[in-house]
Curated annotation (Swiss-Prot):
EC id: 3.1.21.3
Amino-acid positions noted as binding ATP in the UniProt annotation, renumbered to this chain: H307, T308, T309, G310, S311, G312, K313, T314
Top EC class of this enzyme: hydrolase
Gene responsible for this protein: hsdR
Region (Helicase-CTD linker): 859-886
Region (Motor 1 domain): 250-469
Motor 2-helicase linker, as annotated region: 720-732
Region (Motor 2 domain): 470-702
GO biological process assignments: DNA restriction-modification system
PROSITE patterns: HELICASE_ATP_BIND_1
Organism name: Escherichia coli
Protein name: Type I restriction enzyme EcoR124I/EcoR124II endonuclease subunit
Amino acid sequence: MTHQTHTIAESNNFIVLDKYIKAEPTGDSYQSESDLERELIQDLRNQGYEFISVKSQSAMLANVREQLQNLNGVVFNDSEWRRFTEQYLDNPSDGILDKTRKIHIDYICDFIFDDERLENIYLIDKKNLMRNKVQIIQQFEQAGSHANRYDVTILVNGLPLVQIELKKRGVAIREAFNQIHRYSKESFNSENSLFKYLQLFVISNGTDTRYFANTTKRDKNSFDFTMNWAKSDNTLIKDLKDFTATCFQKHTLLNVLVNYSVFDSSQTLLVMRPYQIAATERILWKIKSSFTAKNWSKPESGGYIWHTTGSGKTLTSFKAARLATELDFIDKVFFVVDRKDLDYQTMKEYQRFSPDSVNGSENTAGLKRNLDKDDNKIIVTTIQKLNNLMKAESDLPVYNQQVVFIFDECHRSQFGEAQKNLKKKFKRYYQFGFTGTPIFPENALGSETTASVFGRELHSYVITDAIRDEKVLKFKVDYNDVRPQFKSLETETDEKKLSAAENQQAFLHPMRIQEITQYILNNFRQKTHRTFPGSKGFNAMLAVSSVDAAKAYYATFKRLQEEAANKSATYKPLRIATIFSFAANEEQNAIGEISDETFDTSAMDSSAKEFLDAAIREYNSHFKTNFSTDSNGFQNYYRDLAQRVKNQDIDLLIVVGMFLTGFDAPTLNTLFVDKNLRYHGLMQAFSRTNRIYDATKTFGNIVTFRDLERSTIDAITLFGDKNTKNVVLEKSYTEYMEGFTDAATGEAKRGFMTVVSELEQRFPDPTSIESEKEKKDFVKLFGEYLRAENILQNYDEFATLKALQQIDLSDPVAVEKFKAEHYVDDEKFAELQTIRLPADRKIQDYRSAYNDIRDWQRREKEAEKKEKSTTDWDDVVFEVDLLKSQEINLDYILGLIFEHNRQNKGKGEMIEEVKRLIRSSLGNRAKEGLVVDFIQQTNLDDLPDKASIIDAFFTFAQREQQREAEALIKEENLNEDAAKRYIRTSLKREYATENGTELNETLPKLSPLNPQYKTKKQAVFQKIVSFIEKFKGVGGKI
């Protein structure tokens, strides 16, 4: 990377390197897990780590004592050390979050020694990182619910902060991830475990190495949140040898642990990704080098960061702002956002990262007051407030101070008047912009581009990088044009023609709006993965071109849903909300910019305002809220709505401009578009859908009711490169059905139909899979089926194919209805009939077999029969997320019992059908006996409807739960009160754990030293685990 300014020594200290030459492979011979471990330890020792042998908690504590004494220049006597340990270092009541807080926030302890002198005892020296002692231990054994051996642990000042889990080359890396997951449940967090201090996990199979934060947050625990290390050009560093030579350099690792991790106020530990660190480092380097050269207030003294939407810009900009405040020559850091709503969101986000370091300002006077305070160096403000302040105040002390400006999404009104004022008023500033969509000459409306205002690009991480690293998802774009009479209108791209009044009216033709609304209602559940009873799936947004369009759609949805509810008592309407306001006629800075809607509703015309009032009243009556269109009430409505979209309380949100930029909701997977989008606006709007969430969310679904194909390709080419189209856009339906070659990797991917036919040929009867090799082959093949089906269910063509399986082909009325609903002509209909999908029953049987093998494999593993096995299961990953997404809930199963009974099917046949269903469901397998007993012991004819069956089942299950709990307590001779308390807690959290003391308190009086104690504890624990699996979700008293 060439830098134009004076280079200072600091620039060579980047931890994300510009250059790195890969290590040569040391040999081609087979490398076992222990070989890999030996090599890693040797490499770390060569890099200056000290290897020590520590095998017990007490030895680990003794080492911590020695390291902290050296670091702090003190000596503890035994009673002082005991006091320090019990009160602070390893307080028995500390959980994992308390320990993390001690590394990030409370890392200095004011300790009073026996002779009454007070000393600051540091756990870690954050000012001078290289003073911290780094050591390694291996194969430390920790007792917990299961004794676990940890591969390699890195200690900092004696405390275990990094855990490395290795698997031999060729093993699926997810295996190592799952193992860490198991440890954190079983023993990292057992009482008095210093392993609660762990900050960072590193997993590797030699070929692929990833790191991730130790967090208890379930959504951040997914494998998708693991990351590779990388160079500054985003080339990944995957091999363990290369990872060790770069990320495990002592200076680098300590920086990641201390400077590039954040423990936020929602108590989530976040560790930054390499591109976030690289950008932050380069901003700090630029500020320092410009200051040294006295070269401020010019484009050369700043720069911009191009990081794609959804890649975590807020965390990066926060860290850059936070670390800039620590430079002693900087007086203030302004974090400037563009809109009122973003101001609030950024304040919330910033406060999440660090509650004390941010001053928001309600208005310009508030901003002025904040400038006078010395205690906080970071100020969050909007460009509008900053501009008003500069216009109103000709002389402020801050104008002559050393100031850093960081602009979030730096491409809007900052280009205008505010920039001129800023350059006039501030004498010594360094200005940086973050953007996901820079303005280049190609998409600029005037002469100004991102680079001409902010200076050169300091770091980039574009959408192709993010998709390759699986940090954002691809887009699947449907150009939906099934309305022949509106075709010429929907394919028009000439802006002048589009804005002509008669065309605007034609877009709002009631027939067109009704057809599109009906399409959305028909396809909503399929697009948002809600086709299975009880599945939560995702939610969606509809972006429309004007306030009139929003009104028309909202009213049409309401009418069509009311009509459907009148026809069917079981119809469940979608929960729909809308928000829009007045968009001031501001000049655009770039082609395709989404015009900015303000929170000022007073400028709206009266009919739009009345309509919005009515929509908000409906929202209020549903959610028991009290919002309105007056300015404060409207702002609060915006905030409440944003939260409810994130929580999935809203199914579909209709918007004009708001929420299409800067709004982040990982549960949103579909955007319906009836407006013309281009360049920046298109990328911003599409990016609402492509946040990673879990394995069921494979891409962002975009369904456009106008022809945006050319605009889409133009936008992704501008913000990526010429090959971006192949990376950013999902493959076609035909490619997934028939197979394709991946352009990026050159790998041939089999089509869905090939997988189906192999499945049916090799495993016609899933109940007869006997040998271990057959089991493994089946699991791999059915896993491939689940992954392909999960992707295909987003395609309309696949939904049509599945719908065809459900109709009676001998019924001409049903056939004609099907053709009309799915826009299928005779030729297409004949073609569809040639494609055969496996019957639903067959898939249920396959799912049961898959679940059975998973259970069997877990039992085998626990019994450690693996030693004798000749089949290597290491490269098999069970697709648990995909199974869960198609869960069938208990209410559905009970409804089925009611239907079967009404059709006078015998109990024997009914029980077989119910067993098949339950076994194919991951969450309800343990309830099989309970449901079967219920059928056998209940006179179903006495129950008149579905609701009574559900009530009767829960009454029955609660009675059984009570009876079995008492029997278990008696049989195992447990302490009754403690056992009931422990069972109640476990039922509430839906799993049993051996962490903490709750389980021990239930056991009969036996000394923990008695050899039978451990056996007894294990036996009781296993029985309670089965009990919880069987009765969770049943309710009732214990």
